[in-house]
Amino acid sequence: MITALLLALAQEAVAPDLTWTATKNDGLEAASIQYDVGVTLSAACRNGRFVFALGGLPTMTGSAATRKLDVSLRAPALVSSTWSVAPNSNGSVVLAPAPSIYARHLRSSESFSIRVPAEADRRAQRYELTLPRDHTALDAVMTACGVALENAADAIYDPRPLDVVWAIPPRITPPPNLPSANYAEALIQCSVDRRGRPKDCTLLDENPPRSGFGRHALRMVPSGRVERIDGAPVQEGGVFTMRMTFSMTEH
C-alpha cells in the first residue's frame, strides 16, 4: 500500500541535511524531507496515483478518519484544512486533500507552516519548516504521475472546510471511459446561483492526473443543489469546493 510506505518514511531517522530524498520501491516512487522536529513531508506516485502526506504529527485520541490542520497554503496567514488520516497511523500521518496543489506549493515556496490545534490536554503545536531550493526529486515524482509542475488554477483553491452540503446530490453516472486505475477523484470548485445550483465550475485537482474523470465530474456537478449546513439561505455567488470520487470493485 502507498500509505504504508509513507508511514515508514515518517518513522525513519532524521536526514543530515535539508534535501528531498528520493526512494524507489516495488513500483512506487517517492520524495521526502525529514526535519529535526520529527515532521516528514512526503510525495509518492504508484500506479498513476499521486499522494502528498505529512508525517510525524502528534497522535490523535479516538479513531477519526480526518484531521484538521492550519497550514500556510496562502502565506503568511494560516488557513484551516481537513486532511485524511492514513490507516494504522493514529493521526500521525495525514494525506493532503489536494496533493498536486500542495506539492506545487512546496516546490515554489521557501517555507511551509503547520499548526496542529489543541486536543484534550495537549497544547496546540506549530511547525515552521524551511523548504529546500533544489526540488529535483519532488519534480521527478510529480512527473512520474503526470502531475503538472505549475497550474494557474491553484491560486483560487480554498482549503477551508465547507459550510454547505448537498440538498440534492449530483446525478452520478459511470465515466464513459474508465480511468486506468481502479480509483479516481476530482477536486472541483464552483460558485452557486440563488437556488444553490453549482455554476462556473473549475477542475482544481485530478487523481490520477489526466485520467479524464475530472472532465466527467465537471459535467455531473451542475445537476445537484447545495444548501448551507446552518439552514441559512445560500448566498448567490458564494464559492465552495468539493471532492468527487469513483471506484471500481471486483466481483
Model regions and ranges:
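Sec-dependent N-terminal signal peptides
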Residues: 1-11
